[in-house]
């Protein structure tokens, strides 16, 4: 009997030790990349809260709560990294992996490049926990954790080993002095990447070493003027208009020129890249080149 109690006591002590080995920090304390305005309802969001009653469609506002393109940067000497996060919707889709929808994706800066570490798999409910092995030896390293593509984040905590430290990054990467605004559709938002770091805007951000503001809205990249009026407040080095799959001929003729002029009024010399719809199926389908020729 005494032996059983002793074993149970030791088991409890070990269990408590395992649970207490990480010290958690609020991720809002660290730099957030991919966000134009700090005036948002929740910290991890993409659109200014002043747009709530101005957006053309309620679903557009709903999608703005998705954290596509947002990433938290920090440095630590912890061998392991633990994450606790709570999503807004606990979204599921038949055509996209849960890790891409509502998981976290960890990268480490090594030898001048961002390298994949591991992906934090979400649970079946709103709250998830994951522990990722970051490095074999105790050494200070720079990290970036990408947030979910098709869900929002209410709360995110980063846990480090009990004797480790965590702080703001020393290296500015991706660089913020040559940022890009990427306006588009579900494709730009990240559908259907298997994990957040594999959304093509996030891949390009690492390749080009520049911050990209992801304004991809699934089914809702419809040349809405209020979105252009919002993103022109950024000091971007390039504006990418990648919304053709979500607009129809009449919408393009009605909105494209005004949308373009909103950008040009604030950024008269900044390059604007028009991206053609890759799904042109037949001769006569509307293309950006045909629009410009007709005008």
PLM feature spans:
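Alpha-helical cap/lid subdomain in secreted, periplasmic
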Residues: 220, 224-295
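Sec-dependent N-terminal signal peptides
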Residues: 5-14
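N-terminal secretory targeting modules
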Residues: 2, 15-179
